[in-house]
A protein has these predicted regions:
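Feature responds to low-complexity, polar/acidic, surface-exposed segments characteristic
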Residues: 1-14, 18-46, 57-77, 83-126, ...
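BRCT (BRCA1 C-terminal) phosphopeptide-binding modules in DNA damage response/checkpoint, repair
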Residues: 50, 54-56
Length: 146
């Protein structure tokens, strides 16, 4: 069931990005290296560990450890940064907005300029499956042009 209005967990969006770009995952991964490893679903550990090793994700602090937070809904800004790390789009002029976090500005600007990131998205809001599908379709179309 697609359920277009439900939020996309961070781990699922990462797996979608890696499938889209043909990124091979490590085999036999039992641990990701993140402080919340026990909460990361077994099916996604290879994706998370591979992306961490390749520098495509870095996690964030929960006050006690660096965590990936695989089950939490990914925000639009986080999705832009994650997808951008796999696509490596051409740099674009920074968008002027008080709503784009500084750490996501380059990714949001680049993906917006190439039509992957929907202009005017709420960067702080979790993305839905429909929004993720729209972003990934834009990314697929961008990859086909290369």
């Amino acid at each position: 069931l697609f359920d277009p209005d439900s939020n996309v967990p961070r781990g699922e969006f990462l797996a979608m990005c890696m499938h889209l770009t043909g990124t091979e995952t490590l085999q036999g991964v039992l641990s990701t290296g993140f402080g919340d490893d026990m909460q990361i679903p077994a099916w996604s550990k290879a994706y998370v560990a591979t992306a961490l090793m390749n520098g495509d994700v870095c996690g964030c602090s929960d006050g006690t450890a660096i965590v990936f937070d695989a089950q939490r809904g990914i925000t639009a800004a986080e999705a832009a940064v994650m997808l951008s790390s796999f696509l490596e789009p051409s740099p674009a002029a920074a968008l002027e907005s008080d709503y784009i976090p500084e750490w996501a500005c380059a990714a949001v600007s680049s993906l917006t300029s190439c039509g992957v990131y929907p202009d005017g998205s709420d960067c702080a809001a979790p993305i839905t499956r429909a929004e993720a599908a729209q972003m990934l379709l834009g990314a697929y179309e961008l990859l086909q042009k290369r």
